[in-house]
């Protein structure tokens, strides 16, 4: 009985450990179709992403190209503006220089015209001086008519000289001053014991200046120095 039971147990144990062949999974047609659809969707999705990335790259390239183009245009315009500014500044400087030159030329022309006119008037001033010097002191005291005439001539001379002075014309009377070759013309020299050598002791003809510029030097006699 024991022997039978042992044999039965061994037989049962062998059967339970018989290796089984691997089973092939059961795949339905609908599952296969779904898998194919998913693969195609994944492919299309990857392709769409690739196209989108490509388009983005193209857009970025176009934007970069446009930016470079705009930067180039900006640089060109900036350079052009700088050149125009330089030209404008030079033009303004040239115009101002021209204004200064024109102003100086106009002033020179005025001074020249006034100088010529003044020189023509100086003879009249000299004539007034000669006329007044022609009156003798004794005659002025003896005759009221001569005295009145002298006063009238002197007043006329004073009015005339004041008019010249208003236009920048001044008398140059260097009596007692040191000789200045820029303002005086020495016509003779004489020794004068009581005066300093080189001093103007006689004015033969008055000089005149126009706006501090000599238009006629004074003709003078100066003190001669002692000879060694």
Curated annotation (Swiss-Prot):
It is found in: Mitochondrion matrix. The keyword Transit peptide applies. The N-terminus is blocked. Residues 46-57 have a biased composition (Basic and acidic residues). The keyword Nucleus does not apply. InterPro entries: GrpE, GrpE_coiled_coil, GrpE_head. PROSITE patterns: GRPE. One of its GO terms (molecular function) is protein homodimerization activity. Keywords: Chaperone, Mitochondrion, Transit peptide. SUPFAM superfamilies: Coiled-coil domain of nucleotide exchange factor GrpE, Head domain of nucleotide exchange factor GrpE. GO terms for biological process: intracellular protein transport; protein import into mitochondrial matrix; protein refolding. GO terms for cellular component: mitochondrial inner membrane; mitochondrial matrix; mitochondrion; PAM complex, Tim23 associated import motor; TIM23 mitochondrial import inner membrane translocase complex. Residues 46-66 are annotated as: Disordered. Component of the PAM complex, at least composed of SSC1 (mtHsp70), MGE1, TIM44, PAM16/TIM16, PAM17 and PAM18/TIM14. Interacts with SSQ1. Essential component of the PAM complex, a complex required for the translocation of transit peptide-containing proteins from the inner membrane into the mitochondrial matrix in an ATP-dependent manner. Seems to control the nucleotide-dependent binding of SSC1 to substrate proteins and the association of SSC1 with TIM44. Belongs to the GrpE family. This is GrpE protein homolog, mitochondrial. The gene is MGE1.
